[in-house]
């Protein structure tokens, strides 16, 4: 549970309590205090988001500290204030470049301040609490600095989630490194590949992706309808094709059983249309061992089973009881050629923890909440992401009450519920799609 974080917080407090008595220089002491403050704040943010006010413990407790051990929790105001103060100290005192590659540095701290302050600022605004603007303005400040430090974004969205190394990928601020050789592995893609199919995208998620003209599926002339998945996925934000497995059908007749891996394209052009689109439009290969590419879904952790077709419904399995879905949509975000049949879930692709795209969207949302979002902000944030995804740029002047007929208009049955501002709705859509 989130309460287990206090064991980690105690370890951080042990380190912080002994830094001043060390033989380090004052600058080194300040740096390592900053690292400790970052990690303690990271855990306290999880506690704050789960519980609101919680006990604030900033030193190692003894058995005699009964007032703290048995005392009431601190208020949300106090916890949020401590988190921000610690992170602001860290921002000013941590080594600019950290302690080497992929370590906690100033940009990482600023990215975390951006994330925390947007959360806390909007929570306070929509729950009628004080100081919302303080946190939103701080989000605006640090986000702008991070964006200046990371002016480029990765040109290929898929590379962010399907790369063996994120070290040199533009816009990645901090990532979790994995390696089979070091026995540090993960199984991110496995949830959508087993017979259980633990999680699947929903229709609501698919509907939220814009058409390539920048309009919603509800009012774009490019939308071809949803009676056929090939039509549904046509002329859409390319990130949809990389999040949800696009439709295809292959010829598996050369495979003698469900586990066979022999396949070829059918003679029907439609069956391979999205395979070809991925290759031509996105520079992503499909089905052979090359850099930067997706791979056909297969039963990972076993000896094979290339999936013959998508959509693949759990009530129409075609003798292949895995990678199924009740909705017809499957996760594909982390599928790549670095996965292998029989791998027993030994995945070693790196995972981004902080990247500039999130910070850009934090900035956009904070600016909107502060009433400062305009076309120049859209061009600096949302539209940089859309250009990578083959979506027309956001034109702020065109976003009105009718832009998305499915926008949340609130429910009068619930006191205090409200209609979401159309512009804010579109910024939140971009966050949902990008992240």
Could you describe each region identified by the protein language model?
Residues 1, 88-89, 106-110, 115-304:
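An aromatic- and glycine-enriched ligand-binding surface/loop that stacks and positions planar moieties
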Residues 1-51, 67-81, 85-101, 227-229, ...:
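Conserved, well-structured interaction surfaces
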Residues 5-8, 82-84, 162-227, 232, ...:
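Long, intrinsically disordered, low-complexity segments
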Residues 48-55, 98, 116-128, 369-372:
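Short coil/turn linking the two alpha-helices of tandem helical-hairpin repeats
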Residues 238, 242-385:
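C-terminal substrate/ligand-recognition segments
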